[in-house]
A protein has these predicted regions:
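HhH-family (HhH-GPD) DNA N-glycosylase catalytic core used in base-excision repair
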Residues: 2-503
């Protein structure tokens, strides 16, 4: 089954081999969660396409065509299933793709689908020509970037129509359509029903006043409680609230209309549905695609736990008490926030770092109105840091030493001048080199920042205090040797070792 998975991800055509088609049909029959989001099934007798976990009536084998992406299925003329809802499927990690460029572009298109960006601007952001990007993208996904972007917009709209009571006009704008008429035409052309028809079919949504709720699927096993524990130990006063069942934070993002949207987002687990429940304040609707992308990154919903577990077997066999099934790497919601906090946390305890960061955000963070006690600030922007007359004095009087204040200032300058990129689509290895050129940032900080902000799967923190505590008999060089066979998933090895300390 695992070889089938590998062939499926890397193969040119899932339908070229009768053997592979039969194997994928068996996956579809079994509802194997490992393949959710990695293959979609078009059914010729109904004209719809499904996730592999769909519970609708099983179609005949001869009526099935297999696709690697929802966009590829839609380009072939299939409509999304109303039962399994392909828009909720987990995505793929960067390591899953032959073309790192194509995967980075896909992430950017999905996160920014509500904006008016062009394919040429995406290519330029990634450092390539539009022609090169289109060629790489089509070779990887079987569709053009424009087709993929259209599917992202339509599936986001379908999710908002199904899960919220937002007016159709707001759904259209929040999904990247320039007008309601254009939205209605596209929806009807591709899904053969109008947005209003979809609303009638779904019944009444459960909606809390002033909020919207969306759902994000993941592949089990998924250790949500350990992610929450990680975030709870590092919760930033005024910005984050974490309890036993949920994570809540302030949000400040640019919306599709170019205006800044401020509000809050809450994330909870629905283990029975293998999905996260994401509730956000109504003010964030203009930035909903970006909020969803950031929650996916923060909670590592695109990870494939089977592939990761196989890679970490040497660690589990060598270290008693290490659990590898379902381990996730905690990402972040605000990349600059985490980069700054990584510097603040150098050579001090987590608790001390939290207090320092809390003082900084209380003094210099922008006030955010959320209506939730304890959530009233956003972390500093790059421009906020650069506007400080003397960062050493500003942060120094709050307890941060000069070298770390200077490092934060240098990071802000590098980002502002385009020498450092922590945004979605960045190449982690290149940005780690850029980070290491900043005085005051060493290998630990560079790897930690890449792991948390860029979903870099292969960072290892051999000098980290927690890793050393989990492997007390080994030197840093021996710790590196221990996890060499875990490549390219050593970030997950770090989390497995940290988690073992609380077990």
């Amino acid at each position: 089954m695992n070889s089938i998975l590998s062939d499926m991800v890397m193969g040119e055509d899932l339908n070229a081999s009768e053997k592979q088609r039969r194997a994928l049909y068996k996956v579809f029959e079994s509802g194997d969660m490992r393949f959710d989001g990695q293959v979609f099934v078009g059914v010729s007798s109904t004209g719809i396409y499904c996730r592999t976990v769909c519970r609708a009536k099983m179609p005949k084998y001869e009526n099935c065509t297999f696709f690697r992406t929802a966009a590829e299925a839609e380009a072939a003329g299939f409509r999304p299933c109303m039962t399994c809802r392909p828009e909720l499927a987990p995505g793929l990690s960067l390591v899953d793709a032959r073309s790192n460029l194509a995967r980075r572009a896909a992430r950017m298109l999905q996160a920014r689908c509500a904006s008016s960006m062009s394919i040429e601007s995406v290519a330029a952001k990634l450092g390539y020509t539009g022609r090169h990007l289109r060629r790489a993208f089509e070779a990887e996904f079987g569709v053009t970037p424009a087709q993929y972007l259209r599917t992202c917009r339509l599936l986001l709209a379908k999710s908002l129509l199904t899960d919220t009571d937002l007016p159709v006009s707001r759904v259209a704008k929040s999904s990247g359509f320039g007008s309601v008429r254009r939205f209605n035409d596209a929806f009807k052309e591709h899904y053969r029903l109008t947005p209003s028809d979809l609303r009638k079919r779904r019944g009444k949504a459960t909606v809390q006043s002033g909020t919207i709720t969306v759902h994000l699927s993941y592949r089990p096993p998924y250790r949500f409680s350990e992610l929450l524990a990680f975030f709870r130990d590092r919760a930033l006063a005024h910005v984050e609230l974490v309890d036993d069942v949920s994570y809540t934070r302030t949000v400040r993002l640019e919306g599709h209309d170019g205006n800044v949207a401020c509000g809050w987002v809450r994330v909870e687990d629905d283990p029975a549905g293998n999905q996260l429940v994401v509730t956000m304040s109504d003010e964030l609707v203009p930035a909903v695609s970006e909020v969803i992308a950031r929650v996916r990154r923060m909670f590592d919903t695109d990870s494939d736990p089977v592939v990761v577990s196989q890679a970490l077997l040497p660690l589990e066999e060598a270290v008693r008490g290490v659990r590898i099934d379902g381990v996730r790497v905690p990402g972040c919601f605000d990349t600059f926030e985490i980069a700054c906090r990584a510097v603040i946390g150098q050579q001090v305890s987590v608790r001390a770092a939290n207090k320092l960061a809390g003082r900084i955000v209380e003094r210099y963070g922008e006030r955010i109105e959320t209506g939730i006690e304890g959530l009233d600030r956003a972390w500093l922007r790059v421009t906020d840091v650069r506007s400080l007359a003397c960062i050493e004095d500003a942060f120094g009087e709050l307890g941060l030493i000069k070298t770390r204040s200077r490092a934060i200032d240098a990071m802000a300058t590098a980002i502002d001048e385009g020498e450092l990129d922590l945004d979605i689509g960045a190449v982690a290895e290149e940005q780690m080199e850029a980070l290491l050129r900043i005085r005051g940032i060493g290998p630990w900080s560079a790897n930690y920042i890449a792991m948390r902000t860029m979903s870099y799967p292969d960072a290892f923190l051999e000098t980290d205090a927690g890793v050393a505590h989990a492997l007390p008999e080994l030197t840093p060089k021996e710790r590196l040797a221990l996890v060499e066979d875990c490549r390219p998933w050593r970030s997950y090895a770090v989390l497995a070792l940290w988690d073992s300390l609380s077990g």
